[in-house]
Structures are given as C-alpha cells and as structure tokens.
Swiss-Prot record:
Name of the protein in question: Uncharacterized HTH-type transcriptional regulator YfjR
GO biological process: regulation of single-species biofilm formation
Single annotated GO MF: DNA binding
WYL domain residues: 120-193
Length: 233
C-alpha cells in the first residue's frame, strides 16, 4: 500500500469515527480530537470545514456538535430515509414521521434493542465503509480474509443476523459469504459489475438469512457430495 493510500485510509477512519460520535450526540473538542488522531488542529478544522460541510454543525469555544435546537423536524425525513435504506425500518412497527418525531423529542429511550457486539476495530469500520461504497457504486473489490484472497469479487449485500454482520457476494460464478470480523482488507477496484437480481432476491429470503452462519458448511457439503452409485474415477 502506497503512502497516499495509507493517508487516505487514515482520513476515512478519522471521518467515520467523528461522524459516528456527532450522530451519537457528543460534543467534540477539536484539540482533544487532534491529539487523539495524531494530527494538527488545523487539519481537524479543515476536516470540519471542507469534508464535513454537509453536516449542520455548530461551533463554540473550540467545541463542535450537531445542531439540534429547533431542528428535530428537519431531521425527520433524513431519519426515515436512513431507516429504510439500512433495513432498520422493519424493527419499528408503523415507522412514520409521527413516530420518528416522538422519538427525537423525548428525553429518555422508550425502546430497548438488544446490545450489539463490541465496537469493530478501525479496520473493520473501514472495510464496512468501503463495502457500502462498492455495493452502491457496483464496483468490484479485492477481499482478503482469514485464509482467503478473492480478486474481482462483486459485493451484493451486507446483512446483520444474530448481531453479526455478513457480506454476501458473487465470486467466480459462486455465492461467497464472509463475516465482517474475518475481513482484513477491502481494496476497491475501478472495474464495475452488473447487479445479479436473483442473488439480491435470495439475500432477502428469511430462510437464506437463517442459514448464513452455516453457509460455508452447506456449500462445501454440496460441492464435495458424491452419490453412492457414482462410478469410481
């Protein structure tokens, strides 16, 4: 990996962590962030000014946070779009503007969702981000996981099942499944691919989703199965 690529990776991780903290409602100290990420205050200010300019931020005495006063109603459409595109809408019965607004305006959490797994490492967060970009942009990637290297892999969907993220992809004409935890590196390629509609429909099948933890065993068993009446080679 070149120096420019490493610098780009550090930038992507830094921005993803900053955004996640802002969305979580944290008020961030620019100086503390600079020390944490090992960059200058000037670099952090450029991040906020240029790379995060689309966020509605407010600054005061060296601190930064998402603007919230009087903006809850403006956030409702964005929350609904995010919920539907991420697949979270199905968790909330009858999710609409009224429900989103009620959740945004309350001072306590009326809903409880089972705790997720520990926060992924920076490399896991970067892999997740790159896979989102590859799926939406329909670009092939090189994937390096535990014991495997897949060139020109076409990522299809990211699914969460039993608190584990899975990548479902197509590789050399076959379905490939990986957990996010076992992925070490995702290298985006310039080559694009045509979406496989049949695979996209399959990953939405509840039976397929339930089988994700056992997918490789099932696939290996099918590929190595030899009928009893098969002639010897």
């Amino acid at each position: 990996m070149t120096q420019a690529e490493r610098r780009h990776d550090r930038l992507a991780v830094r921005l993803s962590l900053i955004i996640s903290r802002l969305v979580a409602g944290e008020t961030l100290s620019v100086r503390k962030l600079a020390a944490e990420f090992g960059v200058s205050v000037r670099t952090l200010r450029r991040d906020f000014r240029e790379r995060l300019m689309y966020l509605d931020l407010e600054y005061q005495s060296g601190y930064c946070r998402l603007r919230t006063a009087g903006s809850e109603m403006q956030m409702v459409p964005d929350v609904l779009i995010f919920a539907h595109r991420s697949g979270l809408a199905g968790l909330f019965p009858g999710l609409d503007r009224r429900l989103v607004n009620a959740l945004l305006m309350c001072d306590e959490s009326p809903c409880v969702i089972a705790p997720a797994n520990p926060v992924p490492s920076p490399s896991g967060a970067l892999s997740f981000w790159r896979l989102i970009q590859a799926i939406t942009g329909r670009r092939r990637v090189t994937l390096i996981a535990e014991g495997r290297r897949c060139e020109r892999l076409a990522p299809c969907r990211l699914l969460i099942h039993q608190q584990t993220w899975y990548l479902v992809a197509e590789h050399e004409g076959h379905i490939a499944v990986f957990t996010l935890d076992e992925i070490h590196l995702i290298q985006p390629l310039q080559e694009t691919f045509r979406r496989n509609d049949s695979l996209c429909r399959l990953v939405e099948d509840p039976v397929f989703i339930q089988a994700l933890p056992h997918f490789r065993f099932i696939q290996h068993s099918l590929l190595t199965f030899v009928p009893a009446d098969s002639p010897p080679e």
